């Protein structure tokens, strides 16, 4: 479920009478609050992760990363398999993660996505950097020209 996925390898436990017990209620509340803090809504944190949308699963991963102190996240084509609404939500999540002081590197072939979330855009062609621009100093046409060599 979502709680088990969120705490994977970091479960909260107590020891009583020599036995370790999971602090399920506390883990559930921490998970719920962490999701709220980053702006993600999952109706039931006891839902099986496999029943959630791709966007919801990505949100859980990002939320877990931020909650446990991650400082840099690398997202490789994070929106490739998502629908329009899920992609919009994913872009919002990237912005939320950035606002929390986490550095985010997004690898994408979608110029519009890059322009929406990037502070800097680095264009590579055939394994070489062919251009680097600050988002506020460039636009769609210039980035496409760098990509295509035009």
Language model regions located:
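Glycine-rich phosphate-binding loops of nucleotide-dependent enzymes
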Residues: 1-150
